[in-house]
Each structure stands twice: as structure tokens, then as C-alpha cells.
Amino acid sequence: MIVYSDIKRQFVNDVKDNSIADKILDAIKMRGLNAGHEKEYSSWQNSMQFMRNIVDDSEIDDEVRICIEYNIPLTSKRVDFIIAGADNVGKENIVIVELKQWQKAEVVADDMHYCVKTFVANTDRIVCHPSYQAYSYSCFLKNYSQSLTDESINLVPCAYLHNYQPEYRQTLSNPIYKEWFEVAPFFIKNEVAIFSDFVKKYITKKSSKGDLLYLIDHGRLRPTKALQDSLASMVIGNKEFMLLDEQAVCFDMCI
């Protein structure tokens, strides 16, 4: 389910005139979703300023699509931020951005490959590594959206921790998480230019296929051939299926 969706130019204007958080909240209420509490509202006010800085770039077409708080089908999970369009050669891409306001994090244990410890909701908590979170969301969408397969749309997961202090970067880049940050890179406070270049590698033009987000949201929802192959692989003992958020945390703590 799409919550907020508009072209880049309008998103930039919504942030500039300080109406973005209200628009997201109104859209969530209209759709009857259980979200929009005070801390979440504040996070929209904060994080959208940083994302505006990334997309408000002359190399990114004004009509590229922006989506905020996309509710993943069949789950209660939401993708923080999506940029949808095409690259310089016309290849359709959707960049999935997991946003975090963390300032630092810690490795929980050397055998816990999904999780880190950080200060969230007024206490230290064990949560998913942001790269894993972004990657798992992209896998779930890819496995269940037939439109992505039919239209050859590429998903590009990543994470942006715009408050994260550089001296703690080595925690998130610890080799135990390499499997995740190699497929879903993360960017921190002092890596604005690097993150901007990453986005522009995949998104500079509007899609020739129209609104990719609408296409996915209203497309066929069924297990794709890739998911069927993954399930078959699980039967013979290979771990294929992606765990989401709390599932991954529980798996790490129990194994």
C-alpha cells in the first residue's frame, strides 16, 4: 500500500514548506494504518530534510517518483523511502532506502550476523542491521510482486544513517555483516556525496513505463518463480527465505 507518493519536484516543495510530515500523517490516517505517533512524526520531520538534500539534484529529473512509508503487501512492515525511475540508459530501477537516526551501534556477538545493538525508543535494543533490513524488504517485494518480474524492474536496497557518527562506522562494516552490506550498502553522516552518487547511478530519469510504484502496488501479487525455486531449495536443506525484522532478531538470539 502506498502512503505518500509524488514526483520529486513536489516532494522537495513539501519538505521546503514544512508540510511533508503532515501530509504523510494525513495519508496514513486516511488508509487506517496504525502509525504516526509523536516520535514517528518527528522522524519524518528530521529524515525527510536529509533525503531532500539527496534528491534535490539537477541530475535527477523532477518527475522521478518518490514514495514514503510504503506498506509491504502481506506484512505490517513499511519501507521508509523509495525513489523510482530509470538510469542514464533507460533501465528501470527502484531504490529502497532504510532510514535510521542512530548515532552509533554495537556488535552484539560474533555469531549474530543479522543484528546490532543501538539506542532506540529510549533504551538499548537488539535490532536488525540496516543493510539486512533493506535487503530483506527488497527480497520480499521481489518474491511476491509478479509485476517486478514481468516489467524487468530492478530493486536496489540501501540504508542511510544520516546522524551516524563516523568513528562508529566500523561496527556496521564488521565482516560478520558483509553478506548484507555488499548487496545493500549503507551510508552515514559524512557520506552525503557518496550516497548521492550511488542514487544517481540508478536514478536520473523518469521511467518510460509510467509510475512504477503504482504498477507494483496494483499489480499481480503472487509467489514468483524465484520464490518457488527458493522454497524448493529450502526443502533440500539450503537456507533461502529472508526473515523480516523481529524474525531475524529472534533467529539470531536462538541459534
PLM regions and their residue ranges:
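Compositionally biased, low-complexity repeat tracts
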Residues: L215, S233-I236
